[in-house]
């Protein structure tokens, strides 16, 4: 899980979701997981 100020999709399978007022990226590739900090 990477924590970044600006997050974006890395591949086509990445999905932007909102959890507990935070924007996150989930993907089948676990290296693409991101959270906005």
From Swiss-Prot:
Subcellular location: Plastid, Chloroplast
InterPro entries per UniProt: Ribosomal_bL36, Ribosomal_bL36_sp
One GO CC term, this protein: ribonucleoprotein complex
Keyword Chloroplast tagged: yes
Disulfide pattern: none
GO term, biological process aspect, one: translation
SUPFAM superfamilies per the UniProt record, alphabetical: Ribosomal protein L36 (SSF57840)
Protein origin, superkingdom: Eukaryota
Keyword Plastid: yes
Coiled-coil portions: none
One example GO MF annotation: structural constituent of ribosome
Pfam annotation, one family: Ribosomal_L36
Keywords, in A-Z order: Chloroplast, Plastid, Ribonucleoprotein, Ribosomal protein
Family, per entry: Belongs to the bacterial ribosomal protein bL36 family.
NCBIfam families, A to Z: rpmJ_bact
Name the record gives this protein: Large ribosomal subunit protein bL36c
Organism in which the protein naturally occurs: Adiantum capillus-veneris (Maidenhair fern)
